[in-house]
Amino acid sequence: MRGEHAPASISKMTIMKIKHMIAVSLLLLTGIRTANAVEWQMKQGPMMTPWSETLDPENVLGEYPRPQMERQEWMNLNGIWDLRKAIQDEAYSPDFIYDKKILVPFPLESAISGVMEESDNQCYWYRRTLTIPESMKGKNILLHFDAVDWEAIVYVNGKKVGKHTGGYDPFYFDITSALKQDGEQELAVYVRD
């Protein structure tokens, strides 16, 4: 009969095709996710020291930069950060894909940073997440930088908290108003040299 549709049954062949498409899609998604999951690894530089061989990326210069005044509650954010090359004056986006890892506080030109890259375009985005300890909640939280060469624009959870220009001087921002009540906080820093 013309104009009539076949019964709403799905053949075994159609089910097999759907399963195959789902399997391929999952493999592709896994591959994309794995490609974005970059691990930090120290590069081999022209002059490596014994100190660099024993460096613990989970505890980099743990006592530095320590606030000048003694405080019980503070966090050291040295360690592995996400990194991506930026274009000059690029606006922040939560959708950025960070394709490298860098060991902070080392400059990206150094082997120990894990990047060892020189570029005419010295604009980068640094990113990491952190969780504010219970003991610090409800208090003003200051984010200190020992130095950023040359310009830094700092975002916390997508909100711009400040801009600093000048390569060799310490600075800080009060980030309290940009923090979420609970959970992970995102810290993103645009750096232009």
Set out the residue ranges of the language-model regions.
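Bacterial N-terminal signal peptides that target proteins for export
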Residues: 13-22
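Sec-dependent N-terminal signal peptides
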Residues: 21-29
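C-terminal segment of classical bacterial N-terminal signal peptides
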Residues: 29-36
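N-terminal pre-domain segments of enzymes
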Residues: 37-75
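Core domains of carbohydrate- and sulfate-ester-processing enzymes
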Residues: 77-123, 188-193
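Accessory beta-strand-rich segments of carbohydrate-active enzymes
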Residues: 83-86, 116-193
